[in-house]
Amino acid sequence: MTQANLSETLFKPRFKHPETSTLVRRFNHGAQPPVQSALDGKTIPHWYRMINRLMWIWRGVDPREILEVQSRIVMSAAERTDNDLYDTVIGYRGGNWIYEWATQAMVWQQKACAEEDPQLSGRHWLHAATLYNIAAYPHLKGDDLAEQAQALSNRAYEEAAQRLPGTMRQMEFTVPGGAPITGFLHMPKGDGPFPTVLMCGGLDAMQTDYYSLYERYFAPRGIAMLTIDMPSVGFSSKRKLTQDSSLLHQHVLKALPNVPWVDHTRVAAFGFRFGANVAVRLAYLESPRLKAVACLGPVVHTLLSDFKCQQQVPEMYLDVLASRLGMHDASDEALRVELNRYSLKVQGLLGRRCPTPMLSGYWKNDPFSPEEDSRLITSSSADGKLLEIPFNPVYRNFDKGLQEITSWIEKRLC
């Protein structure tokens, strides 16, 4: 089936799809203070979703394209779940968040099909994959339209990988208790086996969101990157997130000696946001298999255990947490009790001495990840490094921080 036909099949014009903001039925906190974060974007009045401009631009989206799609959503006169929130248009039609971003992705998909230059075609496919992922954001369980956008993103990503430099292999890993999970191994030019970074992404992202990390930082240093989706998302959607948050990644680590392109004696883990929860657990539970663990804006304790911190977090992010935990209609109190169990300090890990070298990067006044969480990580390691990343200028400092983290990883792998 062609990509265009797949799009037509998946996105049939129906209007009874559940609207994203209604999927998690929690009690609202009411008015919340504005939030701005380098990794998560910021809350903007009259939007349910956080607008994550930095990460979208970092992934290759033109700022003007973001504004263009937003303007189409704002101008829509279609029925909304909440008339005060622009991005709550009901049904797959003009003005609906998923519709507008998927429509934008299809423009690039058509450019990719028409382009004769393989590398440029690959760039267009990659751009389409990124836009489909934004369409599916924040990837809540039960969001039928978002899941269809994710399927298109994965197809576009596979098309891109066939045309872009280096090699990408789609891999399956066996995990007891369910179907195998799918990951992508990105390899630089040259002969393997390669030192490899196992990516542990955030809860509101897909594994295909991290190609820029591989292309700009790891590949130039001869380092491969292996990604899998976090539990309950994408290819791992049938796996519920549990307190044993690192379960999937542990099984992947244990399988690496059987992967000929990976040097299993030179592996590091890199965790963004809640992915750092996974990476730090790996540092403790799988230290013989890891040379290093790096974290960025880690969610390992405070947000999971501090009620005041949770009150500062936007509704959308709490909805993401509730969705990942399978608590779509639980009370806020029940959600708080469950989140506390995911704290690595409460679990008895953080605070104990860990032999694995660990780096943690943080931003001051980050509402999701205070400095104390990063200090807790680095002080627990026998070889810890704390990295403060200044907020402004946000893009330049984000790039500089990633360069420093990559250099630190490289020294421990190569």
Swiss-Prot record:
Gene Ontology MF: a single term: carboxylesterase activity
Family recorded in the similarity comment: Belongs to the FrsA family.
Originating species: Escherichia fergusonii (strain ATCC 35469 / DSM 13698 / CCUG 18766 / IAM 14443 / JCM 21226 / LMG 7866 / NBRC 102419 / NCTC 12128 / CDC 0568-73)
SUPFAM superfamilies (UniProt xref): alpha/beta-Hydrolases
Taxonomic path: Bacteria, Pseudomonadati, Pseudomonadota, Gammaproteobacteria, Enterobacterales
InterPro entries named among the record's database cross-references: AB_hydrolase_fold, FrsA, FrsA-like, FrsA_esterase
Keywords of this entry: Hydrolase, Serine esterase
Catalytic activity, reaction form: a carboxylic ester + H2O = an alcohol + a carboxylate + H(+)
Protein name per its UniProtKB record: Esterase FrsA
EC numbers: 3.1.1.1
